[in-house]
């Protein structure tokens, strides 16, 4: 990670850390870096989620892009993967999404996509950071006809919706509960599933700028679980603020997380001979039960660091077409170049329809090991160096010794927040509590801020 860019773009508290001034510079410098080799006038697509700070940052970012002669297509509220899709299919120079994904409304973020629809390489981010830190802005300042023009492009949303529908199946007879997190999916998910002939009920569809992800969406699926059982729905689908992830709920109200979703889609593709190299790419956070289920089906796996960008890098480098995270980021490379919650939802419901199986039946092959994750607030300067603290390293080694191979421990820094995450898996909840609580107590004593 760089000084400004984390694992998912630039993030911070809106108007405090991520200011309009910084957004202007990101537009100006980011736009320049991504379009400096264009032979024609560059075009950049810009979208946002529903946060109250979105329009403020959008205006500043667009001003920066226009100031270096870039033509800006303003998409309005749209899911992050919609930007990625449109950049590729409309042959734009780049795309920019203004969102902090699953974070609360006070935060916001800015992430860039290259002309290929993928997030930026580290080298490009470092080039932008060098311009941000330069003592003087020496980039061109065109005037008159050299300035960029702003184009409102609401039809981008409709094109993305039509794309999603073309990948699905007729869902007539399927009852679906949707939770759009008062976020970007609130403008599209209803339309997509109605076009697929599903019988739908929707919550989290009334954004006011402040209620995005607020007790709702993929990080808070409790309301959706209640809705599924109350309406006797066949499946519940919960998206996060920018709709790049999906958490599902089965007909009994039980959570079906990213691991189980990847298994269901992966097994379906494998049985049809469509899973590239018969392999799924996942991260170190995936549950042991997921790995065991893949082994039982003869499906291979590749494991990366946490973060969908690392999953995508592995997929691109070795030609895999399915990967993702337990948190619900699922990348289906045959269709899109980034995690896409609505696309994943369309594929999951298509599999239910084609197989005639309930979601609980499809997910039953994955027996999840009890897992506990604790987030401990630490100084940003310490979260990357926690393992250098002798007491922390010692307690982790002690707990791993007690596990004797029947479980695992993962201690890692958050890529976007000042947190150290302590996770353990073991055969019983009691064992998990013991391992996590013991390690967390030492971390708090040594470097915790609470």
From Swiss-Prot:
UniProt: Mg(2+) binding residues: 101, 240, 242, 244
Residue positions of the active site: 101
An annotated Gene Ontology molecular function: phosphomannomutase activity
PROSITE patterns, alphabetized: PGM_PMM (PS00710)
Catalytic activity: alpha-D-glucosamine 1-phosphate = D-glucosamine 6-phosphate
Organism: Streptococcus equi subsp. zooepidemicus (strain MGCS10565)
Cofactor requirements of the protein: Mg(2+)
Similarity remark: Belongs to the phosphohexose mutase family.
Free-text cofactor note: Binds 1 Mg(2+) ion per subunit.
GO CC entries: cytosol
Post-translational modification (record): Activated by phosphorylation.
Protein name: Phosphoglucosamine mutase
Keywords attached to this entry: Isomerase, Magnesium, Metal-binding, Phosphoprotein
Gene name of the record: glmM
